[in-house]
Amino acid sequence: MGKAKNKKKVLKNKQQVLVPGILFVHPKKGFGFVSPDQPDLYPFDIFVPASDLKGALDGDHVLVALPFSQRGGEKRKGVIHKVLSRGKTVLVGTIISLISPTLAMVCVNAISPEVPLKAELLPKRTYKIGDRLLLKTPGWKENYPSKEPPPLAMLEFMGNISNAKTDFPVIKAEFSITEEFPEAVVQEASQFLQKHVTQALHSRKDLRDLLCFTIDSASAKDFDDAVSLTYDHEGNYILGVHIADVSHYVTPNSALDQEAAKRCNSIYFPGKVIPMLPSALSDNLCSLKPNVDRLAVSVFMTFSKEGFLSDYRILRSVIRSKYRMTYDEVDEIIEKKLAHPISKTILEMAELSRIFSDIREQRGCTRLVLPSFTMSLDNLQEPVALVENKQTAAHKLIEEFMLKANEVIAYHISHQGITMPFRIHEPPNEENLLLFRETAKAMGFTITQTPTQEPDYQYLLQETSAGHPLEPILHSQFVRSMKTASYSTENKGHYGLCLDYYTHFTSPIRRYVDLIVHRLLFHPLSVEEGHLEQIVRACSSQERVAAKAEGAFINIKKARFLKKFLDEQPATLYKAFIITVSPEGLSFVLPELCHEGFIPAAKLPKKYVIKTKLGLEELPEHLLPGIPISVQLASVTLLTQAIEWTLIESKERSSSKKKKAKAKSNATQVKKKSSSKKKKAVSKAKKNRGGK
């Protein structure tokens, strides 16, 4: 009966099909993508221009109208037909002008940062520009916006934007993030004491004498993982990865479990964490602190001297971490700048991680160098420093070991015939890769065409751009051509890692999926297969929400940071690199600030304006991606978080032709170098393929 109705509904308009899904809206540019509810029928996201959102907001459950001609096509561009349910119950607005004591114009980033909306203010209070308000999300109406939408209703006053301490409460409200735990959850967590570890000893492997230790940042509190390294009688590596056994404490359907399932993950802000679990567990009993007994799930993996897996064991254990090491300390040991009782073990671990890294290169895995930074805040929550994060040998060591553990666990559970959550990363669309190839070519780089193109990208990214000033741009553009990694009960492999089996197992303190994977290892019947599908979708969705919340918090803090720069050093010139040029304007990246900016065409010098959209090969050389430019801050408006830039034409600039010729020369040399290296790698990879 239901199917007949659906068919009849489609036939009413033979030109389109209505696809239900979740809408995700770009926070700055305003366009959106709908992730279909039925990925098997529609295995792609549907692009929705800002002009076709029809009043739909980020996170809404919508029906998107997709023309029949595009169902299997390349464009996949749709129009919002209907909002089935709102994703957010509240919005946050900032007053930009007052109409009367009870009516104001507000900027609401979630709806439209460019177009102010009316808001009815609560009485008995004096308001001023910059006041931040909690507003009720408007209901959706057909034919939106056929007339001016009604004023938004104010629910609560949240402070003024001049006070940086209001940023965090605003982000929590905007993204419906709950910080405090319900009393029942706190009580359940507090009932667990150190004696529970002692009581569990009889049913676990006692590894308290094993030399294992944690490696984390200096500020970390929740230690998910510890590592160990020993050898068998043949000299093979035995790598131990020991993960906090959160599943021992958080049992199915308990108050702790239900709350963790709602949160799905911990959310990290500068100087602040919203944990998935109460601190009694996350920072204490589950955290693998040094010199105390802790329950763990230990994975021992035996590797040949060449780094290939020959055996593994998975068991529940009790461990006692011997040291709490920081990344900086481990780096100093690797660089022979620090003597430590475990220096020998760390140096051997570093060698093993390098072997793993080489194997990843051989199979064509893309190693990306993406710009990132840490923002420091003072006691008033004002940003005071922006420090670039660099991936060091210590970071790579832990990354390689965790990748191996996640891969082994995925292989193990899936070969038990158990339905499980995989961490998948599907191959990119060919049209996206084509755009990346064109961008790389315009920057002076060359990618050799082969039947399997992954190694070509890997060698381009690693060899051609290593140490190159355009490295962050090239790598960022490559990431944009990729699909987003997510969770799925269907194993589709991991494109970025070039792995057939991959999951998340190593962070159960901060990720709910990892906790589920732990349960599947020892109590698979405790996870209902039907419920698992819901968990997977919820965790993928909440992961996006967390990323948006973290990004929104960084954006307002960065606006404050740049405003301070503008006030104190208004004449400062910043070196930037062009990303794209269009009739709308010019977008660029500032590596030193880890920031992307945009200058509209109306504010550009004439030589930087194009009237029609041009292919990369048609652009003048001074407009090509990667060309350096100088920019200056023009204005920073906290009310709307708008950051405006001015392009400053440099009097002395080296010829772009010379730079392009040099880049091409470099690319040719790398091409020759990588070609012979690739042949050796492919030969070696084929020889060792049966190692696992």
From Swiss-Prot:
- The segment(s) forming the RNB domain are 204-525
Q: Where is this region: Disordered?
A: 651-692
Sorted alphabetically, the Gene Ontology cellular component annotations on this record are: cytosol
The UniProt entry, under Pfam families, shows: OB_RNB (PF08206), RNB (PF00773)
Q: Where is the composition biased (Basic residues)?
A: 670-692
Q: Which biological process, per GO, is one annotated for this protein?
A: mRNA catabolic process
Q: Where is the signal peptide?
A: none
In alphabetical order, the GO MF annotations are:
exoribonuclease II activity; RNA binding
Q: Which residues cross the membrane?
A: none
> Subcellular location, in the record's words?
Cytoplasm
Q: Which UniProt keywords apply?
A: Cytoplasm, Exonuclease, Hydrolase, Nuclease, RNA-binding
InterPro entries hit by this protein: CSD (IPR011129), NA-bd_OB-fold (IPR012340), RNase_B_OB_dom (IPR013223), RNase_II/R (IPR001900), RNase_II/R_CS (IPR022966), RNase_II/RNase_R (IPR004476), RNase_R (IPR011805), RNR_Ribonuclease (IPR050180)
What reaction does this catalyse?
A: Exonucleolytic cleavage in the 3'- to 5'-direction to yield nucleoside 5'-phosphates
Q: Which residues form the S1 motif domain?
A: 563-648
Q: Which PROSITE patterns match?
A: RIBONUCLEASE_II
EC no. given is 3.1.13.1
**Stored PANTHER family:** DIS3-LIKE EXONUCLEASE 2, RIBONUCLEASE
Homology family: Belongs to the RNR ribonuclease family. RNase R subfamily.
**Protein's job:** 3'-5' exoribonuclease that releases 5'-nucleoside monophosphates and is involved in maturation of structured RNAs.
UniProt-recorded name of the protein: Ribonuclease R
> Which species does the entry assign this protein to?
Chlamydia muridarum (strain MoPn / Nigg)
Name of the coding gene: rnr
